C-alpha cells in the first residue's frame, strides 16, 4: 500500500524539480500541503499531487491552444 502523504523530497522527485522549488510551491499556496509534527514538517497528500499534475496538464494544453507554434518559433528552436 502506498503512503497517503509524501515528503517534499518525494514530491520533488516525482516532478523532477528541486526540493526548494517544491517548498516554494507549497509556501506560495500553489501546491496544497499540510504541516505536521513538532518540527512542522510539510507533507503533500498523494491525491492532491495527482490533481496538481492534472491541473498543470490542463493549463499547458490551454496555453498551447492559445499560443500556437509559428514558423518563427520553430526557426528559433532550431538555433
State the predicted function of each range.
Residues 1-16, 20, 24, 46-79:
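Basic Lys/Arg-rich amphipathic helical interaction modules
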Residues 15-42:
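Major-groove DNA-recognition helix of helix-turn-helix-type DNA-binding domains
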Amino acid at each position: 500500500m502506498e503512503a497517503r502523504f509524501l515528503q517534499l523530497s518525494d514530491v520533488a522527485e516525482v516532478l523532477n524539480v528541486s526540493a526548494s522549488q517544491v517548498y516554494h510551491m507549497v509556501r506560495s499556496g500553489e501546491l496544497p500541503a499540510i504541516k505536521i509534527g513538532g518540527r512542522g514538517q510539510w507533507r503533500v497528500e498523494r491525491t492532491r499531487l495527482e490533481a496538481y499534475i492534472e491541473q498543470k496538464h490542463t493549463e499547458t494544453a490551454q496555453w498551447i491552444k492559445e499560443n500556437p507554434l509559428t514558423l518563427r518559433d520553430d526557426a528559433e528552436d532550431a538555433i
